[in-house]
């Protein structure tokens, strides 16, 4: 299976490492690919020429660029009732799709919306019904471009107080006729609600990409500190996940995302040693 590393653990949230350095690092670790992040590693105003250079360099190093992520949507939502902000999020997504096409990326991570951002009180609280309707409308706006440029829109299950269960996700995704719209499934983000293998079993071919990470429960649920700094420690049953992935003939990316919130308030990224250890542990999974 294709195994990759998300940029943030290696390069941080402000783009401290270049795409070329990240490619070199992944190649040295024996990975199949990397996941660039737009807004830090990859600037939103990057040119087609620079994207082609990066893609060519990755090809020489035999490093895939199958997925791409962003943290943009936490501050600018596709589901906000604020029309100006929503338009800004839609326009960002169009640029994001174009960058993916230039780089040869097949799948981008999109956060469909949020009823509340629990760690940011400055963000508005929006009703579940409105998030459903506005996010659907926004995704419909960008889907034609995604189809034209052959880029998948993978909506991630995050702590956005929206779409908690596998069946909610199925109902939501079934609204979209396009095969370009699916889920970017995070194995750890769902653990306070349901087992990850249950989502995969129900969503099947709608699973377009996977974030590999872990979560440790506390007090019958858990908070941000449940996201530790050891990929192999936590609630995720990787053997069960692999079994269900094989049952649906999953061929997408398996990308380790390591943001060790358990270290708060002393979390520091980038952490190259943690990135290296995470790569080695990822390689022991999904054999």
Show the residue positions of the predicted features.
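Histidine-acidic metal/acid-base catalytic patches
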Residues: 1-32, 140, 166-185, 189-287
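Conserved beta-strand positions in the central sheet of alpha/beta enzyme cores
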Residues: 35, 67, 109, 154, ...
């Amino acid at each position: 299976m294709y195994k990759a590393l998300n940029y943030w653990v290696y390069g941080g949230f402000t783009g401290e490492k270049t795409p070329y350095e990240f490619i070199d690092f992944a190649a040295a670790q024996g990975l199949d690919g990397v996941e660039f992040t737009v807004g830090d590693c990859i600037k939103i105003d990057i040119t087609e020429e620079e994207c082609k250079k990066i893609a060519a360099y990755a090809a020489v190093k035999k490093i895939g660029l199958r997925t791409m992520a962003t943290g943009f949507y936490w501050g600018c939502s596709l589901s906000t009732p604020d029309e100006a902000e929503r338009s800004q999020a839609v326009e960002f997504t169009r640029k994001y799709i174009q960058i993916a096409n230039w780089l040869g990326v097949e799948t981008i991570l999109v956060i469909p919306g949020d009823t509340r951002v629990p760690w940011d009180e400055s963000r508005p609280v929006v009703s579940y019904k409105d998030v459903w309707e506005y996010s659907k409308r926004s995704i419909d706006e960008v889907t034609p471009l995604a189809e034209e440029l052959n880029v998948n829109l993978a909506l991630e299950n995050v702590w956005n107080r929206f779409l908690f269960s596998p069946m909610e996700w199925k109902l939501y995704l079934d609204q979209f006729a396009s095969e370009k719209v699916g889920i970017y499934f995070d194995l750890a983000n769902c653990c306070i609600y349901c087992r990850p293998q249950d989502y995969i079993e129900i969503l099947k071919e709608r699973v377009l990409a996977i974030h590999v990470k872990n979560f440790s429960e506390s007090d019958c649920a858990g908070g941000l500190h449940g996201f530790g700094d050891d990929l192999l420690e936590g609630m995720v049953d990787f053997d069960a996940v692999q079994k269900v992935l094989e049952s649906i003939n999953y061929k997408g990316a398996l990308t380790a995302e390591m943001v060790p919130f358990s270290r708060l308030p002393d979390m520091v990224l980038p952490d190259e040693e943690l990135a290296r250890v995470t790569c080695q542990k990822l390689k022991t999974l999904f054999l």
